């Protein structure tokens, strides 16, 4: 199956189509600049329904922060690159809380990294938006998910419109007040994917005051999807995942964090969703044909 970017720019609820494209963009953010451009051209440029697509690479070499912004006539998608090593942001200094958007505090390392590309990022968004109403979306994996969350919060706090956020393997980003204020205005359009034992989703620890934001979307040890799952069920599933991984190389918590695993899981459920939609449309078509055939004179 050839991969293409597809997106519902007007979605107001969870969408597997948008989740798939955001996962693809979060994965692509790890590539080199030239490779990103090549894939966008191949995966967007070959589609007749995608008009006037463009993109821009954002980078600060000093802070090693990267993102890219891509656009069509209808939407803009910002994807932040994650960290090559999940432990890069686990030092005590990096986990300090500092004043952030809204009334709460956020992760100092994430905030400083975002600040280093903020002017370039907002300039790209403004240029691509122009005088058109384009929906604005954010995504990222790992560190990139934290950057995307704070970026969304900053824009919302400044009164700008943002339409959705899909994150994968996201660490906790801010404190209780930040999470409360963020969720008050954006929880219903923020979808935070967690894969079973992904260790990064449990740091920085709650004991340091950190809390999660958004609406949980959970994949269990068997790859099954849960839109809602309680604490105890998640705990037992994590234990099951650990036990199942005992005699395999590597650590379950690190392996579950890999963006390639998120991509595989999201793609599988996206394809299932497409099959369900196709089956529903076919059933509707058959019903219409049946009703027409029973009408007098038809």
Regions found by a protein language model. Give the residues of each.
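Non-catalytic, mobile gating and regulatory segments of ester bond hydrolases
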Residues: 1-139, 143-298
């Amino acid at each position: 199956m050839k991969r293409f970017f597809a997106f519902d720019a007007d979605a107001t609820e969870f969408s597997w189509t948008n989740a798939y494209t955001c996962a693809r963009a979060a994965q692509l953010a790890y590539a080199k600049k030239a490779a990103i451009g090549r894939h966008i051209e191949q995966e967007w440029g070959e589609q007749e329904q995608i008009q006037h697509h463009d993109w821009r690479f954002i980078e600060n070499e000093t802070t090693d922060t990267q993102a890219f912004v891509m656009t069509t006539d209808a939407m803009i998608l910002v994807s932040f690159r994650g960290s090559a090593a999940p432990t890069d942001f686990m030092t005590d200094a990096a986990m300090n809380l500092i004043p952030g958007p809204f009334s709460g505090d956020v992760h100092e390392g994430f905030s400083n990294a975002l600040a280093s590309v903020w002017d370039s990022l907002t300039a790209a968004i403004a240029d691509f938006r122009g005088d058109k109403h384009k929906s604005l979306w954010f995504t990222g994996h790992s560190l990139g998910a934290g950057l995307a969350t704070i970026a969304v919060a900053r824009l919302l706090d400044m009164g700008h419109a943002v339409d959705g956020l899909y994150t994968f393997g996201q660490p906790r980003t801010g404190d209780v007040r930040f999470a409360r204020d963020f969720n008050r205005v954006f929880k219903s359009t923020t979808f935070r994917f967690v894969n079973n034992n992904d260790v990064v989703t449990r740091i920085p620890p709650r004991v340091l005051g950190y809390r999660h934001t958004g609406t949980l979307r959970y994949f269990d040890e068997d790859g099954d999807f849960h839109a809602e799952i309680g604490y105890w069920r998640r705990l037992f599933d994590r234990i099951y995942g650990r036990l199942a991984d005992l005699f395999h190389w590597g650590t379950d918590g690190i392996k579950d964090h890999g963006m390639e695993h998120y991509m595989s899981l999201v793609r599988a459920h996206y394809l299932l969703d497409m099959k369900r939609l196709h089956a529903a449309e076919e059933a509707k078509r058959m019903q219409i044909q049946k009703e027409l055939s029973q009408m007098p004179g038809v």
